[in-house]
């Protein structure tokens, strides 16, 4: 499980241990509509919806993009994101790595359908939650074949 050893991580509250199963509780986010926004009068002040892009995702993307060219700024973005989740900042001899950023992205985007695309982009192995089996990354897994009709009728 992603949050096994991180007791102070707020995202642990997204899960509930059932009888032998782990269930994800976080499925829909709510957005607060500010009082002076130009919205229809029948809208309630909080609306259900699906995030298109999280601020925390932007911080993780920025940390990954800067990791090799501006380590201090990458660390600043990473620490800003993780501290907003109740985690202590990285300091001292703990060096920020691509794997740490990937794991943080995986935790932050759990259940939102984005992790697979990140795994594909980074060509990561897939570890099954069901039986802990590792499926090696390959084109067979990540590349969808072009249908034959596309070749037959494209001219």
Region roles according to the model:
Residues 4-155:
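Acidic/polar-rich alpha-helix caps and helix-coil junctions
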């Amino acid at each position: 499980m992603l949050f096994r050893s991180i007791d102070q991580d707020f995202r642990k509250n997204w899960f509930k241990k059932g009888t032998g199963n782990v269930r994800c509780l976080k499925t829909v986010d709510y957005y607060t509509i500010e009082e002076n926004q130009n919205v229809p009068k029948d809208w309630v002040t909080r609306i259900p919806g699906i995030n298109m892009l999280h601020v925390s995702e932007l911080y993780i993307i920025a940390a990954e993009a800067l990791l090799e060219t501006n380590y201090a700024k990458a660390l600043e973005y990473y620490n800003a994101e993780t501290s907003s989740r109740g985690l202590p900042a990285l300091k001292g001899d703990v060096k920020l790595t691509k794997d740490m950023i990937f794991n943080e992205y995986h935790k932050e985007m759990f259940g939102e359908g984005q992790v697979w695309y990140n795994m594909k982009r980074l060509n990561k192995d897939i570890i099954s939650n069901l039986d802990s089996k590792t499926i090696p990354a390959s084109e067979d897994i990540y590349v969808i074949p072009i249908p034959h009709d596309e070749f037959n009728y494209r001219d």
